């Protein structure tokens, strides 16, 4: 499976009349105003201090640095995990994050895709929970019940902060032999451009995963703003959930455990929303005041 050519622009031009689910175009102005990026303090002329970045993340997660691995976004972490498991077979619960499948296939892993857990009888399971396509999630207990069936389970929790269901198994991964949890700021604080992701697991897996890390895993800019962003995460997530509750209560939607809503039919907003291949109209969340500005007063769907 080939990736998108690196020399062709992947993203469509920004259109103020079209909501693009790949970008945070309706960005939360509250968050923008609170994050102060002073280039003079970023020290671009030296390599970033990864140890300090790890300490900031460790304090936020309340997890020992020896149980954490940082990468350039969740995608980098998942790629390294696929390298780590290159001699094993991997099952991927679909539909899901496309690059997980691409990485596995391009690295030569024996790959099996299925919509059903019962069909996946591989060494490794990759599970996005909540699912970034359908918005569905399974509970923490359901995830843990799968552990005896696989040598390893990778749980991608990029959307977990927005879930109605208690689904995160990050803390549980510290004390079991075969569980790795992937996290990201791309969704939790709407900052995909920073490319900051991490995973949590037992110390043995983390130590081995660190052996295949890049020479650096964080930029000076990310290091400079990380603590501010992490501190803003809870309030930002609360604002996004408030918007989701407002939309799902007013419009006909499929309940979503992610940072997006799935309208069953076109909600007739002032900005157009693309239709997904599943036939829904998907919109990434923004703050409620921004949403009301693009909402037609009489529109319900």
Language-model segments: residues:
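N-terminal "arm"/small-domain region of PLP-dependent enzymes with the aminotransferase-like
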Residues: 1-49, 59
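Conserved core of the PLP fold type I
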Residues: 41-148, 159-176, 180
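Short, solvent-exposed loop/turn segments at secondary-structure junctions
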Residues: 24-28, 97-98, 130-133, 160, ...
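PLP-dependent aminotransferase class I/II
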Residues: 178-254
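Structural motif
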Residues: 124-128, 154, 198-200
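Conserved glycine-rich beta-strand-loop-beta hairpin in the small C-terminal domain of fold type I
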Residues: 240-248, 253-265, 276-281
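Conserved PLP-binding active-site segment of the aspartate aminotransferase-like
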Residues: 201, 262-301
């Amino acid at each position: 499976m080939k990736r998108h050519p690196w020399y062709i622009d992947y993203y469509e031009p920004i259109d103020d009349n079209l909501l693009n689910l790949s970008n945070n175009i309706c960005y939360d102005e509250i968050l923008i105003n609170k994050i102060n990026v002073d280039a003079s303090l970023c020290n671009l002329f030296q390599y970033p201090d990864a140890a300090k970045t790890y300490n900031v993340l460790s304090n936020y997660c309340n997890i020992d640095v020896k149980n954490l691995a940082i990468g350039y976004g969740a995608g980098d972490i998942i790629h390294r995990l696929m390298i780590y498991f290159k001699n094993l077979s991997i099952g991927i619960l679909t539909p899901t994050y496309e690059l997980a499948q691409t990485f596995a296939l391009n690295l030569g892993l024996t790959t099996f895709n299925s919509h059903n857990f019962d069909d996946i009888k591989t060494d490794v399971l990759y599970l996005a929970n909540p699912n970034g396509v359908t918005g569905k999630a399974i509970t923490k207990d359901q995830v843990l019940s799968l552990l005896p069936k696989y040598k390893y389970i990778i749980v991608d929790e990029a959307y977990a902060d927005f879930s109605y269901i208690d689904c995160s198994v990050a803390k549980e991964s510290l004390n079991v032999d075969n569980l790795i949890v992937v996290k990201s700021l791309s969704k939790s604080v709407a900052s995909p451009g920073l490319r900051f992701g991490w995973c949590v697991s037992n110390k043995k897996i983390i130590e081995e995963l660190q052996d295949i890390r890049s020479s650096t895993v964080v930029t000076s800019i990310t290091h400079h703003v990380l603590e501010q962003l992490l501190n803003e995460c809870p309030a930002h997530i609360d604002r996004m959930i408030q918007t989701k509750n407002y939309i799902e209560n007013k419009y006909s939607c499929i309940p979503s455990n992610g940072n997006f809503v799935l309208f069953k039919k076109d909600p007739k907003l002032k900005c157009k929303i693309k239709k997904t291949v599943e036939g829904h109209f998907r919109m990434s969340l923004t703050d409620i005041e921004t949403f009301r500005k693009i909402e037609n007063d009489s529109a319900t769907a």
